[in-house]
Every structure is written in C-alpha cells, then in structure tokens.
Amino acid sequence: SVVALLLGQAIRDGHIRGIDDPVTRYLPELERQDPRFAQVRLRDLLAMRSGIAFQEKYSSPWSDVAIFYLTQDLGRAVAGLKIAEPPDQRYRYSSGDTQLLGMAIERATGQRLHQRVAQDLWAPMGAGMDASWSVDSAVLGQARAFCCLNARALDFARIGQLMLDRGRVGPRQVVPA
C-alpha cells in the first residue's frame, strides 16, 4: 500500500525510528484512551495484527469502517477505538490499522499524507497527473489513509513498477528496498 511506502520513507528520512516503535510514540493520546495501546507497534498496524477492535463490515451503516468513511472528524472516530486482544495474535483486515499508521506518519513527519505522496512518490516517479486523497473535512484535513487515494490508473501502475524495480526510478532510490 502507499501508506506502507510512506512509512518506509519516513523511517529512511529519520522521522520514525523503526517499525518496532509503539504507535503511542507518535499518537500519545491513544495511551490515554487505553494503556494497552502502548503495546501496539507500527509493525502490528502494518501487518494488521494490532488487536484493535474494528468492524470491517461494509453491509452495516453503523460499523467502524462506515463511520470512518462518513465522519467529518477522524480524530474523534479514532478516539473511540478499543483494544480487543493483545497485538500480534492474529491477522484481521482493519482499515483502522491503516488509518492509525497514516496518522502516525503525519504526526512524525509534520506533513499531510497528500503532501508526502506528491513530493516523495508522484514527483520522483514522473506521475502524469496529481493525485488527491479524500479527507475527513476541509477544516481538519485528515486523510482517509485507509482508502480514497485518487489517481490515474497509469500512475498507480507506476507504483507497481516502482515496487518491481525495488524502489528505484532510474538511478534514484525513491523508497527503501
């Protein structure tokens, strides 16, 4: 995913120490919600093994994923997340994990995800058109990191080629291999 590429770049650039960092290093408010969030590492979010209770149920308008799609305040939606089990127990697809990862990257780098995509992926890849990332509201501007990156198919194909080329575009290493 694009968020995983941005995480690799944030680590390479020294904004994030590594994938074994607890998410609470970047989102300390989670630990105030529930001290067990301190056990959740970026690695757990990346692998969707966080143990966070998150309903990925697209048929229900009241599921967590529906709330994340519709909310105008993702920060408030994230504040409602709960720990269901210790991290790294089992894989469970979770848009919530990707959202937390995106928020941690933004907090660590001091940049919005769409800014990082534009300068650190799209420009070096030679993308044909700008991408846009849907946000919770014009006022808050929090990217819906779990979805909603809008771009041309050709530019998404460039991401695939970037991965096939081990993160390189010509001689330039765009993302860590």
Regions from the PLM with identified roles:
Residues 1-19, 45, 101-105, 156-162:
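Active-site SXXK
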Residues 30-33, 64-65, 86-90, 102-107, ...:
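Second-shell loop/turn segments in exported
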Residues 81, 86, 98:
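Acidic/His-rich structured neighborhood in mature extracellular/periplasmic domains
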Residues 149, 170-177:
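A penicillin-recognizing enzyme superfamily signal
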Residues 12-52, 80-82, 109-146, 151:
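Active-site helix/loop module of the DD-peptidase/beta-lactamase fold
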Residues 61-80:
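Amphipathic alpha-helical interface segments
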Residues 97-104, 145-168:
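Active-site-proximal alpha-helical segments within enzyme catalytic domains
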Residues 56-60:
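Short, solvent-exposed loop/turn and secondary-structure capping segments
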